[in-house]
Amino acid sequence: MSNCAPAIERRFINTPRARIHIATAGEGRPVLLLHQTPRSWDEYRDVLPRIGRHYGAIAMDTVGFGDSDALSFEENSIEAWSACAFDLLDALGLPQIAVVGHHTGAAIAIEMAAARPERIAAVALSSPPYVDAERRSRHAGKPVIDQAPRTADGGHLLALWRMRQPYYPAGDTDLLDRFIVDALKAGPLAAEGHRVVNRYEMDTRLPLVRCPVRVVAAAADPHAFPVAGKVVGAIAGASLVEIAGGMVPFPDQMPEVFAETVLAFLAHAYPVRSNDMTRRI
């Protein structure tokens, strides 16, 4: 463990389905960080060095977001995104990892733990959605946030800003600027990513998760906070911690608190091992 924050390094990894962009920091046991829709690794820009003091932290751009290649539009699903994450782990030679996911990233983390339990040692779910039959039915065919068709006068930029502004700290511009950049890069997936989550049969997958799980509930997130207890109740042995003041952009809104919360969980569920401390990602 180092007291100095490690530098962030970025690169592309070729995998069977897509060329995937990652950002890494630190050395040691690998921890994969998965972002929300329509963000990118940048959501963890200030988290990576903090986790990288103790672990080999990897933030990937989910396929179709950030700088990662996209799948064909019809292929997009939580299951496909999970499979692409495993492709990345295979390419990096990582047989087992811990996973941290926020919003959409939490849904992908759940699928990874359910699909390949032998490869997932621990999972931290930050503001996870809870998708059951009722939610799938309620959202089918309905408009979603970040649905802002392009207009010649640039009105879609203001529409995106105004849709997201209520869920960000009052007076913020920096976090919203970062969101806008990622939303524009994602193109149609900025909205489709939310539909992908709403189609996911999460309720059938949660009981299959067997590794240690910590649900981190941002208390000022009006979408995820009310259902945090349902996620915890559906996973045997899962625990819950609530974060006062945490909002939808929790990882980049409160990076120090986010990292400390994740590290406190990993210290018990996925402890640092001396023989892994010099392992580079």
Residue ranges, per PLM feature:
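N-terminal cap/lid segment of alpha/beta-hydrolase-fold proteins
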Residues: 1-19
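Conserved HGGG/HGGXW glycine-rich cap/lid loop of the alpha/beta-hydrolase fold
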Residues: 16-69
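Active-site loop/oxyanion-hole signature of alpha/beta-hydrolase fold enzymes
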Residues: 45-46, 58-100, 104, 256, ...
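Flexible "cap/lid" loop of the alpha/beta hydrolase fold
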Residues: 110-115, 121-152
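Conserved alpha/beta-hydrolase catalytic His-Asp/Glu region
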Residues: 135, 150-208
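Short beta-strand/loop motif that positions the catalytic acidic residue
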Residues: 209, 215-217
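Conserved alpha/beta-hydrolase "acid-adjacent" motif
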Residues: 222-227
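Catalytic active-site module of serine/aspartate enzymes centered on a nucleophile-bearing elbow/loop
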Residues: 238-281
